[in-house]
């Protein structure tokens, strides 16, 4: 087993993958791979998981209902000016479940629909915490009126919370923050992070089970897509809107 973070660079991906033999390659990122790389992996009989091709096994987190629940939570707390800090670029974001849920439910819950309330990341070499920190500074310097913010992942959300502190904004008294992933470290911060998570142990077990079945049978199975439910994990980073 090899766990790695490949640079989002065509040559780096080619060099890393071409020099190794993988029975299975699981893509846990939103990273894209060229047709050349995918053809190379398929030629080596590598089983691909979470790649946007016909022969790949796909494991999805069903977070649509949970993301809507997050929007309702903010609405019930009186928030109407809700921003978004993305760790991906604008082209990917509009096709990402998190971005889709945000856009779909803005009007449903009476939030202000302003494109300038969303900031994106175009530098995939940066760590998520730095992306959250820098884009948090950028967003709240430009729009201090925002009272709640969604962040693409928990690590970036912690970066946003650091940015808020430097700007003299309190969480959640001045700004409520919601992350995504449900990582353990978010529960250890003060305030603890409200986030969208899932049972990652069961998720991993089910993925391993399906992958092993596919390898042992050495034949495609009828079922290629597997869905896992997400859940809202309430922390201390969301509170009533105190700034009207």
In which residue ranges do the predicted regions lie?
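Bacterial carbohydrate/catabolite-sensing allosteric modules
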Residues: 2-24, 33-244
């Amino acid at each position: 087993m090899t766990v790695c973070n490949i640079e989002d660079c065509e040559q780096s991906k080619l060099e890393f993958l071409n020099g190794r033999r993988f029975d299975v390659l699981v893509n846990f990122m939103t990273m894209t791979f060229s047709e050349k790389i995918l053809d190379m992996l398929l030629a080596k009989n590598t089983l691909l998981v979470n790649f946007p091709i016909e022969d790949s096994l796909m494991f999805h987190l069903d977070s649509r209902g949970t993301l809507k629940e997050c929007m309702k939570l903010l609405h019930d707390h009186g928030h109407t000016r809700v921003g978004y800090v993305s760790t991906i670029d604008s082209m990917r974001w509009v096709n990402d479940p998190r971005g889709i849920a945000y856009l779909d439910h803005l009007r449903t819950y009476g939030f202000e629909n302003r494109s300038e309330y969303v900031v994106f990341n175009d530098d995939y070499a940066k760590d998520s915490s730095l992306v959250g920190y820098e884009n948090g500074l950028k967003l709240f310097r430009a729009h201090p009126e925002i009272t709640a913010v969604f962040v693409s992942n928990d690590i970036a959300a912690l970066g946003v919370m650091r940015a808020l502190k430097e700007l003299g904004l309190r969480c959640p008294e001045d700004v409520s923050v919601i992350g995504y992933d449900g990582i353990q470290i978010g529960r250890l911060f003060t305030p603890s992070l409200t986030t969208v998570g899932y049972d990652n142990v069961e998720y991993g077990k089910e993925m391993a089970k399906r992958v092993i079945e596919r390898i042992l049978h050495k034949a495609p199975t009828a079922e290629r897509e597997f869905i896992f439910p997400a859940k809202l994990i309430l922390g201390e980073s969301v509170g009533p809107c105190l700034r009207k």
